[in-house]
Amino acid sequence: MTNIRKTHPLMKIVNNAFVDLPAPSNISSWWNFGSLLGICLVLQILTGLFLAMHYTSDTTTAFSSVTHICRDVNYGWIIRYMHANGASMFFICLFMHVGRGLYYGSYIFLETWNIGVILLFATMATAFMGYVLPWGQMSFWGATVITNLLSAIPYIGTDLVEWIWGGFSVDKATLTRFFAFHFILPFIIAALAMVHLLFLHETGSNNPTGIPSDADKIPFHPYYTIKDILGAMLLILILMLLVLFSPDLLGDPDNYTPANPLNTPPHIKPEWYFLFAYAILRSIPNKLGGVLALVLSILILVLVPFLHMSKQRSMMFRPISQCMFWILVADLLTLTWIGGQPVEHPYIIIGQLASIMYFLIILVLMPVASTIENNLLKW
């Protein structure tokens, strides 16, 4: 009798994705982040669901409902901080996952890559709206500043902003709709992640060498299931260290002050995972130019497959491109640092130079490095 795992209409889908999936024998720990992102998403949906049971999306009670969760709800504090720090872990995994894709040329799988970029946008939108919900000072002013950017769009800008706000300022209507969207988006992300996986399984995984591995495949289970469990344990360990020892390490103290439209915080800044994009936005003196640069800083990922000039897929055997990649990583870290600094003399010019470098590396220097390496192969 054939195994039910291989015959049952539902079970065989799971089987072909997680058990009998042929996987390259040499994929490294950089390939763990896909499953870690899945774990992060499930964790965020579960903790978010329990938070939503006690949260109220009304401007008068939102802040105190979060306080109530932390003080009065059984284990509410741990659920709240797992959700807040879970978002940080989510973005760490996302950045690692995208970085892996860039380094090893995984972007050659066009459909998988483009759905991944959409997933990144959706996750960023979800995180932004989630940050507004506690209705602290940084929630309110972050929402005001970021939504206001849309007013830079010619002709329809102002109407668009007021339509999103549901009034003439960020108020009750804005908070309610942000809560609604924040609740629904993770399920859309989950659906997109399944499509992402569907397209990946059409081609099979890439591997560190970038060379097709059809001749050398091993079953996903037990080899990579056990490897993923190790990754998951490390992820949960780091998350729980954050939650239990320094839950507010990555947060902003201003968000412990209830939202006050009459009092602007001295330094408005988003959560750490948006700082690189925020630095790019701020480094351009023109409003519309800044907004375009902000969107392009992420949207540029769509162009990466078309800028691939190398005869090799992976950067494993391309030292010049490797150098460019790590300069890009250093540049992103610089932008993240600048995004959290006040807008004054040394930081402005550093931010502008780092922003120029970011686009220059991706659009010019990486393709040039690839072309040089192609010519070096002829020697």
Curated annotation (Swiss-Prot):
SUPFAM superfamilies: a domain/subunit of cytochrome bc1 complex (Ubiquinol-cytochrome c reductase), Transmembrane di-heme cytochromes. It is a multi-pass membrane protein. Heme b b562 binds at H83, H182. The keyword Iron applies. Its cofactor is heme b. Gene3D superfamilies: Cytochrome Bc1 Complex, Chain C. The keyword Cytoplasm does not apply. The chain crosses the membrane at residues 33-53, 77-98, 113-133, 178-198, 226-246, 288-308, 320-340, 347-367. Pfam families: Cytochrom_B_C, Cytochrome_B. Heme b b566 binds at H97, H196. Binds 2 heme b groups non-covalently. Keywords: Electron transport, Heme, Iron, Membrane, Metal-binding, Mitochondrion, Mitochondrion inner membrane, Respiratory chain, Transmembrane, Transmembrane helix, Transport, Ubiquinone. One of its GO terms (molecular function) is metal ion binding. Heme 1 (or BL or b562) is low-potential and absorbs at about 562 nm, and heme 2 (or BH or b566) is high-potential and absorbs at about 566 nm. This is Cytochrome b.
